[in-house]
């Protein structure tokens, strides 16, 4: 028997599409599956070429809605619909490389908030930090959670946060967090695949 504890389903969620070096024409997006099929593993993994430049963000394959930008609100709505229909409880935004994607998060909040006001049980939101975790958690706090303009625009904003032990959850390194961050969030310790 699994026990009586309520289980929740969370998903890692990326907001990089259209950011960093992946900002050209989306019909020229770097698709790892197509590169591998056409050029082989050496071009995809070992060579720096115009087909698969090192340091460029790659799609693993063509997404259901095409090579979209994370700022596309139509795609956000479709994602929200599918995630809600699937019963996903929360999303964890990838901020592991110290990019907060705050403008994209704010756009996503505007879509999520519409549905929240209409009574939809939307997936709640959280962040995962790793690189420069303390600084990144503080920027997320300042730019999103403690943003006076956002709170004024969205009076029920706090209802969008995924809470753990009575406070919004964030994944990070608690040893790097300042007192404000430690007080505001429940910090779940960041783990990394290659960490010793």
Say what each PLM segment does.
Residues 1-196:
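Glycan-processing catalytic domains of CAZymes
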């Amino acid at each position: 028997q699994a026990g009586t504890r309520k289980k929740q389903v969370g998903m890692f969620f990326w907001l990089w599409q259209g950011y960093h070096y992946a900002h050209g024409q989306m019909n020229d997006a770097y698709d790892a599956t197509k590169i591998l099929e056409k050029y082989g593993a050496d071009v995809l993994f070992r060579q720096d070429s115009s087909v698969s430049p090192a340091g460029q963000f790659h799609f693993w394959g063509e997404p259901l809605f095409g090579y979209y930008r994370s700022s596309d609100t139509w795609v956000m709505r479709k994602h929200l619909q599918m995630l809600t229909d699937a019963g996903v409880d929360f999303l964890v935004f990838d901020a592991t490389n110290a990019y907060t994607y705050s403008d994209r998060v704010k756009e996503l909040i505007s879509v999520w908030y519409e549905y929240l006001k209409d009574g939809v049980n939307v997936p709640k939101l959280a962040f995962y930090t790793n690189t420069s975790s303390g600084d990144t958690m503080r920027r997320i706090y300042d730019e999103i959670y403690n943003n006076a303009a956002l709170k004024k625009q969205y009076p029920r904003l706090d209802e969008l946060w995924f809470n753990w032990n009575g406070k919004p959850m964030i994944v990070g390194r608690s040893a790097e967090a300042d007192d404000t961050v430690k007080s505001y969030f429940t910090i779940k310790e960041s783990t990394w695949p290659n960490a010793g």
